Amino acid sequence: MESLVSAFVVDLHIVLVLAVIAGALAVIVKGADLLVDEAVALSVTWGVPKMLIGATIVSLGTTLPETAVSVMAAARGLPGLALGNAVGSIIADTGLILGLAAIIGVVPIEKRVVNRQSWIQVGSAGLLIVASLPFLSLRTVFVDGGRIPQWVGAGFLCLLVLYIWRSIAWSRRDSATGAAGPIAIEEDRIHPTAHPVVSLLKLLAGIALVVVGSQILIPAVEETAHRLRIPDAIIAATLVALGTSLPELVTAIAAVRKGHGELALGNVIGADILNVLFVAGASAALTPGGLLVPPEFFRLYFPSMIFVIAVLRFGISGSRDRLGRPAAIALLVAYVITVAAGYLLPVASL
């Protein structure tokens, strides 16, 4: 869709391009508001923590752009782009988006639920690295890279189904034992009037608006940047890198603005898990012979991913009932370090 938008805006007058940007922003904001409202309504109706709603339904929707981009890249013989999209999104979601969310507003932490999902996040990142290793030629991994076999990609998709199933089971258990968090307090503030199916459809509509709006916004902003003669390197480092993570960003900002920061936390952690199991998994499973892993991933991008996730893990462990401002600043600093390393260290581009 982005290519169609790019072809459409390239011949438009700058005023019309700015109008397209304004319209896309309006669609994104409306979609994010609808997404957050209906996610909270489902949380209250089902007695499920908002963090789990964010980690499952919402993150499944917001990671669709990454999945589409990575699968198409793998099909075109661009493994670096396919895997780089997934790993780059994990770094941006965790460092930039969650860091900004915790700076802008309050991100509550329900320790039992967050720790459970966070360790799955850590485990999935580690699993991605292990699955990429060429165990018969480990000495040359930094030169020749590795490969995620096709059957491993299929296994990732099976683990995705298991993750969603276990999340549903955990939510039911937490609800039954009263460990689902402050749901009762939410019921005093929010009174869902629609049937859960209607709320779910509205939530999906909100996700669609956010995703479609993002697909329109990025090419329009990129065209404006070109006309303003902004260097391509700056465009690549900002607009292109942020493009597929924009749904998570606007969802996080809308969530904390409305006082539902745990939804933002759940969306980011869930998106990280799905970027491994869904995005990388689908890319490898649909690529004959498996997904090649260029050597620069072992030299830079995998360590960067683990570094940012470790900062979040320490931030959660050192926080009580919310992700504190020091942890938020640490996440942003970690993100800046990883981006700077990508430009300063002598590694090949994705």
Model segments located where?
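Hydrophobic alpha-helical segments, chiefly the membrane-spanning helices
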Residues: M1-L350
